[in-house]
Every structure is written in structure tokens, then in C-alpha cells.
Amino acid sequence: MGFRVLVLIVMVTTSALPFTFSEESGRSPFRPALRSEEAQALRHGLTLLLARRADGQPSDMRQPEMRRPEMRRPEVRRPEVRQPEFAESPVGQKRWDVNDCIHFCLIGVVGRSYTECHTMCT
């Protein structure tokens, strides 16, 4: 989120930086070259983004279905981690315990927290 705001601020700032020389008397010799609808839209978007951030609302103002496909989070089907029954363990092998379950849950599935893994394994 912070990176997007920084990029937007840089875009708005750099859009106002290109200057053209103005030879009109009584005016500053430099004036912004870019006073387009695009610059106004960027400023308006930044204002809305900062206002939403101050209100604690999500930063993306568009509906999820209107986002570009690369911006959508892929739906990942996570395999169910379960504790095997005692009967499934071959004789002579160590029985699967809660700590092993939590360990493999944490390293095997990206994005799971310790609390999620503990809840699933117990």
C-alpha cells in the first residue's frame, strides 16, 4: 500500500515538473507545461486515496470485478492438513504428532500462520 501511494505521489509531482519558458511580461518565466486532464485526474485520485486512507477504508476504490486480472489475487486451493489416524501408521514408525503437523503446515503451505496451523492440527 505504501509503495502505491509513493508511486502516485511521484507521478503527480513529476507531471508538474516539466516547465516551458514563458516570455510574457509580468509573469514568471517558468510555468507548468502539463495542465492536462490526466494531471487533474492523478491529483483527484491521490486526494481520494489519501482521504480513504485517513478514514481507514481500503485503498483500492474500484470494485473487485473491475480490477485488472493481474491485480486480482489468485485463488489458491490449499490442501487440507490432517493428522493421520494411529491405524494408518506403519508398525515401527514414529506416530505423526501435533508438532510435526504444525511444522509441515508452516513450511508446506505459503501464507498460513502458526495459529491457523495449530487450529488445523489439533
UniProtKB/Swiss-Prot annotation:
Residues 23-96 form a propeptide. It is found in: Secreted. Keywords: Cleavage on pair of basic residues, Disulfide bond, Secreted, Signal, Toxin. Residues 62-85 have a biased composition (Basic and acidic residues). Disulfide bonds join 101-121, 105-117. Residues 53-91 are annotated as: Disordered. Expressed by the venom duct. Residues 1-22 form the signal peptide. One of its GO terms (cellular component) is extracellular region. GO terms for molecular function: toxin activity. Belongs to the conotoxin R superfamily. The cysteine framework is XIV (C-C-C-C). This is Conotoxin flf14.2.
